[in-house]
């Protein structure tokens, strides 16, 4: 289960593996997102609560990871 503050490993587009700390979850489709119990949720104005991101918007979600080389912004598919 993925949480903010976890140490993670990921591979970039050049197949280089990095270790880092997950610092934030972001989305191009939603303003307010969070990582709760390993599930990315967004604030629904309609229901006035956090709900899981819909499959059609999963590609808009990315994660900020702090490494020794700086900050990296990665997709869910890049985690090892």
Describe every region a protein language model picked out.
Residues 27-46:
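Short peripheral tails and domain-boundary helices/loops at the edges of structured domains
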Residues 14-16, 70-71:
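Short acidic/polar mixed-charge low-complexity motifs
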Residues 40-80:
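Intrinsically disordered, low-complexity, charged/polar segments
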Residues 5, 17, 60:
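Short coil/loop residues immediately preceding or within conserved phosphate-binding loops
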Residues 16-28, 37, 53:
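Short beta-strand-centered aromatic/proline hotspots
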Residues 11, 23, 66-68:
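A structural detector for beta-sheet-dominated domains
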């Amino acid at each position: 289960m993925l949480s903010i503050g976890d140490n993670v490993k990921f591979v970039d587009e050049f197949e280089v593996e990095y270790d880092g700390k997950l610092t934030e979850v972001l989305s191009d489709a939603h303003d307010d997102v969070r990582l709760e119990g390993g599930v990315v949720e967004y604030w629904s104005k309609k229901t006035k609560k956090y709900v899981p991101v819909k499959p059609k918007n999963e590609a808009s979600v990315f994660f900020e990871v702090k490494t020794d080389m700086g900050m990296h912004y990665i997709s869910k598919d890049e985690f090892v």
